[in-house]
């Protein structure tokens, strides 16, 4: 008689960041008081979580470990992350799972649209993992999701936060043709930190991507953001502002980098609220229509309220010019 031993049932769970497993722990300084947030416990948070789970959706709020999830979900605000939960890049700052993703779910656009409808969102933010494995980087899936939301929720304004579509010819044009209200693509950090923080991306490609959106459709608002506390110098942050204004970007967000795990890039320092206030004032003087800069600022935080302010700022600028 032969006894078969089942080794599959005890298979270890695949690590979330296998490419970082061999790295020594990176120790960050303790968080200051101004970084602390309350744990999410409200009924509104639970209701939003239930709608997300019932529709089998992924949110960047959960995957990236956003500190604002309790506040946003309590208000029924969620940022949907399409095309799966696994990214083909391995950025040093990001908590999203890395590896080879599954195929696209053709029903996902409809599921996202249904969740938007159930939540009664006036403004929705759609982001995605990087999908370097796809010929178009997922551009058609973005467009399909926008179209599905337009059909089921015609009054909902749509903001997208996209990957860089590096070496994906024609992908950007497909997404812009779907006419999102806001096109966001984050630079994430200053150029000198790209090799250690965002090695799979190219700084000036990202700047050019944002500039190209405006060239294709000047009516679309453009937006970008960076994290600070990664070892950048103040003058480098100001240069990023100038680069984004040269690309006619409307909205800038600046927030504090927070280390997801000890295997991720360390926090080099915590930027004070007063320094964030200074960055915000300078950015407005450089011509941005909208600026949000604070320790807990994230791309999608208060996105609906900020979109209303962004529209008002453009209208005021046009009236003053006329």
UniProtKB/Swiss-Prot annotation:
GO terms for molecular function: 4 iron, 4 sulfur cluster binding; lipoate synthase activity; metal ion binding. [4Fe-4S] cluster 1 binds at residues 61, 66, 72, 300. Residues 73-289 form the Radical SAM core domain. Pfam families: Radical_SAM. Binds 2 [4Fe-4S] clusters per subunit. One cluster is coordinated with 3 cysteines and an exchangeable S-adenosyl-L-methionine. It is an enzyme of class 2 (transferase). InterPro entries: Aldolase_TIM, Elp3/MiaA/NifB-like_rSAM, Lipoyl_synth, rSAM. One of its GO terms (cellular component) is cytoplasm. Residues 8-25 have a biased composition (Basic and acidic residues). It is found in: Cytoplasm. [4Fe-4S] cluster 2 binds at residues 87, 91, 94. It catalyses: [[Fe-S] cluster scaffold protein carrying a second [4Fe-4S](2+) cluster] + N(6)-octanoyl-L-lysyl-[protein] + 2 oxidized [2Fe-2S]-[ferredoxin] + 2 S-adenosyl-L-methionine + 4 H(+) = [[Fe-S] cluster scaffold protein] + N(6)-[(R)-dihydrolipoyl]-L-lysyl-[protein] + 4 Fe(3+) + 2 hydrogen sulfide + 2 5'-deoxyadenosine + 2 L-methionine + 2 reduced [2Fe-2S]-[ferredoxin]. Its EC number is 2.8.1.8. Pathway: Protein modification; protein lipoylation via endogenous pathway; protein N(6)-(lipoyl)lysine from octanoyl-[acyl-carrier-protein]: step 2/2. Residues 1-31 are annotated as: Disordered. Its cofactor is [4Fe-4S] cluster. Keywords: 4Fe-4S, Cytoplasm, Iron, Iron-sulfur, Metal-binding, S-adenosyl-L-methionine, Transferase. Belongs to the radical SAM superfamily. Lipoyl synthase family. This is Lipoyl synthase. The gene is lipA.
């Amino acid at each position: 008689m032969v006894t078969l031993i089942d080794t599959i049932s005890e298979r270890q769970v695949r690590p979330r960041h296998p490419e970082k497993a061999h790295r020594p722990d990176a120790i960050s300084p303790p968080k200051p008081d101004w970084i602390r947030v309350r744990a999410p416990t409200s009924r509104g948070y639970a209701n939003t979580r239930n709608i997300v789970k019932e529709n089998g959706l992924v949110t960047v709020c959960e995957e990236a470990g956003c500190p604002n999830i309790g506040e946003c979900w309590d208000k029924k605000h969620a940022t949907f992350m399409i095309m799966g939960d696994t990214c083909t890049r391995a950025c040093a700052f990001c908590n999203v799972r890395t590896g080879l993703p599954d195929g696209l779910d053709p029903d996902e656009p409809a599921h996202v649209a249904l969740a938007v409808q159930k939540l009664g969102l006036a403004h929705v933010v759609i982001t995605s993992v990087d999908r370097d494995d796809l010929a178009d980087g997922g551009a058609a899936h973005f467009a399909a999701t926008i179209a599905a939301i337009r059909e089921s929720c015609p009054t909902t304004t749509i903001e997208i936060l996209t990957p860089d579509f590096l070496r994906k010819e024609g992908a950007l044009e497909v997404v812009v043709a779907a006419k999102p209200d806001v096109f966001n693509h984050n630079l994430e950090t200053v150029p000198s930190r790209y090799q250690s923080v965002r090695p799979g991306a190219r700084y000036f490609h990202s700047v050019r991507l944002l500039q190209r959106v405006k060239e294709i459709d000047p009516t679309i608002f453009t937006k970008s953001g960076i994290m600070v506390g990664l070892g950048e110098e103040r003058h480098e942050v100001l240069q990023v502002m100038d680069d984004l204004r040269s690309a006619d970007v409307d909205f800038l967000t600046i927030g504090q980098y927070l280390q997801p795990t000890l295997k991720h890039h360390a926090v080099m320092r915590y930027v004070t609220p007063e320094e964030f206030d200074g960055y915000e004032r300078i950015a407005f003087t450089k011509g941005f229509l909208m600026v949000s800069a604070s320790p807990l600022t994230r791309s999608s935080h208060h996105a609906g309220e900020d979109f209303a302010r962004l529209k008002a700022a453009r209208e005021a600028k046009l009236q003053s010019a006329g």
